[in-house]
């Protein structure tokens, strides 16, 4: 089906041990070039996070889709100087993703102070063809969710006017136990 093909291939990720902050820094450099100083980009990283077994390019795409949406939402505001996007990493202990309990996960947060996601869209934003912008394709977050799922991860969103947080959870442990 066409939508499935647009969401990306179903091939397995090309996994390698990768520093998650390298992924976030690549996204940050791309967004800073696009924003041209119109927003503040804040980095709040936990330096103790070990390398993860991930597909670096896929994770860059997943995070870039979220951060680019935040930039576009902030650009729609009248006063661009107040726009702020934060990239934050932390570790969490004993966290369940799906039916699997993980001893340790990395939590990446993309936080912005934009207008928020309308309540009527919040339950469906990860579905294909759902967009909050008239010119949006509605594929970015569906692709992001697909990539995170391929990495046995979880993505969540919490939003209200002035504060939107996308949280990505990726397992750090390879020996998780079903719960």
Predicted regions and their residues:
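Conserved DHp (HisKA) dimerization/phosphotransfer helix of two-component histidine kinases, i.e.
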Residues: 1-34
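Conserved catalytic submotifs in the C-terminal HATPase_c
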Residues: 40-50, 92
């Amino acid at each position: 089906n066409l939508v499935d093909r647009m969401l990306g291939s179903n091939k397995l990720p090309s996994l390698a041990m990768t520093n998650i902050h390298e992924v976030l820094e690549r996204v940050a450099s791309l967004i800073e070039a696009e924003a041209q100083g119109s927003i503040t980009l804040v980095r709040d990283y936990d330096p103790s996070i070990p390398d993860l077994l991930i597909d670096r390019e896929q994770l860059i795409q997943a995070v870039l889709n979220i951060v680019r949406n935040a930039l576009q939402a902030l650009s729609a505001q009248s006063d661009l100087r107040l726009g702020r996007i934060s990239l934050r990493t932390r570790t969490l202990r004993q966290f369940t993703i799906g039916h699997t309990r993980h001893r340790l996960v990395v939590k990446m947060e993309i936080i912005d102070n934009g207008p928020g996601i309308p309540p009527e869209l919040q339950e469906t934003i990860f579905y294909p063809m759902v967009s909050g912008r008239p010119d949006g394709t509605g594929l970015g977050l569906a692709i992001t969710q697909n990539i995170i799922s391929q990495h046995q991860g979880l993505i969540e969103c919490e939003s209200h006017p002035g504060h939107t947080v996308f949280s990505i959870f990726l397992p750090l442990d390879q020996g998780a136990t079903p719960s």
